[in-house]
């Protein structure tokens, strides 16, 4: 077996891409075989598992959200927010220079859970306000204001907790995904979610907040 480490400033995928062709062109003696093992093999198997089970997990997520809210409009609002988080992730990858490999993908999947939690909390607060007889537009404003502090506190503690990992060779990409993705997703939660709610429910501003 042959093993090597990766110097700081380089990723495993980058190094593997540079040496793979030369290594695989080596003619082996009769009876000898060659295969990639260790971290490369483990990540490949993990990626296959994600590709296999992600559609089922996504379908279950939709079913749970519909059952939770009792309608389709609010789950659709949540699903509209999730892809937009990739904007923050892309910015993070470009600024830090990490590849969007296995660990960043794992970080993004974890990030989706945080986003869903924050959006559910905000939508639930809007629903509570409306059930209490508050005008729809007023309910959106007051719910967003009341949920801003908890959402920001949760996002800030998570982001600060990821900062030390940002400088790690193995987990730096995952940390960058969560830090930049969650920063952008928090803004989506507080600004885009209320706007989508008003659009889906055709709510217009009233004189108090116009």
Model-predicted segments: where are they?
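Hydrophobic transmembrane alpha-helices and their membrane-interface caps
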Residues: 60-148, 152-171, 180-184, 188-191
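Short, charged alpha-helical segments
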Residues: 14, 178, 190-194, 198
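Nucleotide phosphate-binding site architecture
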Residues: 44, 160, 197
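Non-catalytic alpha-helical coupling and interface elements of nucleotide-dependent molecular machines
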Residues: 20-27, 55, 64, 96, ...
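Interfacial helix-loop-helix hairpins and adjacent transmembrane helices
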Residues: 195-210
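Extracytoplasmic/periplasmic membrane-proximal domains and adjacent transmembrane bundles
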Residues: 1-57, 66, 137-139
């Amino acid at each position: 077996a042959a093993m090597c480490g990766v110097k700081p400033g380089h990723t495993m995928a980058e190094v593997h891409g540079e040496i793979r062709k030369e290594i695989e062109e080596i003619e082996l003696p009769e009876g000898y075989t060659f295969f990639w093992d260790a971290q490369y093999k483990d990540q490949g198997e993990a990626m296959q598992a994600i590709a296999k089970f992600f559609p089922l997990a996504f379908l279950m997520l939709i079913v749970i959200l519909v059952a939770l809210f009792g309608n389709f409009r609010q789950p659709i609002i949540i699903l509209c927010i999730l892809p937009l988080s990739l904007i923050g992730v892309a910015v993070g990858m470009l600024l830090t220079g990490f590849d969007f490999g296995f660990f960043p993908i794992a970080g993004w999947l974890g990030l989706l859970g945080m986003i869903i939690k924050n959006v559910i909390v905000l939508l639930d607060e809007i629903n509570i306000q409306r059930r209490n007889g508050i005008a729809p537009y007023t309910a959106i404003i007051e719910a967003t204001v009341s949920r801003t502090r908890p959402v920001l506190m949760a996002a800030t503690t998570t982001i600060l907790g990821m900062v030390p990992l940002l400088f790690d060779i193995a987990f730096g990409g995952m940390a960058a995904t969560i830090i930049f993705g969650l920063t952008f997703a928090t803004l989506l939660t507080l600004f885009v979610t209320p706007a989508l709610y008003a659009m889906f429910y055709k709510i217009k501003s009233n004189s108090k907040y116009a």
